[in-house]
Amino acid sequence: MTQTVPQALQDFSLRYQQAWQDKHNELPRSEELADLVSPCVEEKRDGAVLWKAFPREEMADFTNVENAIELTLHEDIKLFFGSQYSADMDATWQGNELTLLQVWSDDDFTRLQENILGHLVTQRRLKLKPTVFIAATDAELDVISICNLTGNVILERLGSDKRDVLAETLTEFLSKLEAAV
């Protein structure tokens, strides 16, 4: 049976949590998110929060972004950002480091939507095919995105048409990610 995006994301989140626990003997920890409310927070300790990914009861709604840009987002984009709350998670893809971007809270989701809209407006202005970022890399202008037309996961150079396909599907990409803690 084919794995869904929410299942693949949950599986990676559990692999990340387990890798963190194996290394640090506690749930994943964040100092940066210590003062922000989230359903992910399990415990506050020493100026940090211990957290774990938390499934959303209802899928997040991207209608406002789609209406504003007059574009239907690829279903995998909506499933990726709309199925759980989590802190960002460090990972490697074929030995290359990245940070998988996630939604910490409803306030964070609002900011994400604004960033997605700004990204899509810029792409439209530059006459580029629409993509939505899902991970940051060490290279300032390189991001990992989902192509809105094909659903391919790509390495994209911001502001240019330079794109390399990393995986045919998001589930394939998530299943091959390795947690980096």
From Swiss-Prot:
Its main location: membrane. It comes from Vibrio campbellii (strain ATCC BAA-1116). It comes from the Bacteria. It is found in: Cell inner membrane. It is a peripheral membrane protein. One of its GO terms (cellular component) is cytoplasmic side of plasma membrane. Keywords: Cell inner membrane, Cell membrane, Membrane. NCBIfam families: PRK04968.1. The gene is syd. Interacts with the SecY protein in vivo. May bind preferentially to an uncomplexed state of SecY, thus functioning either as a chelating agent for excess SecY in the cell or as a regulatory factor that negatively controls the translocase function. This is Protein Syd. The keyword Cell inner membrane applies. It holds the Pfam family Syd.
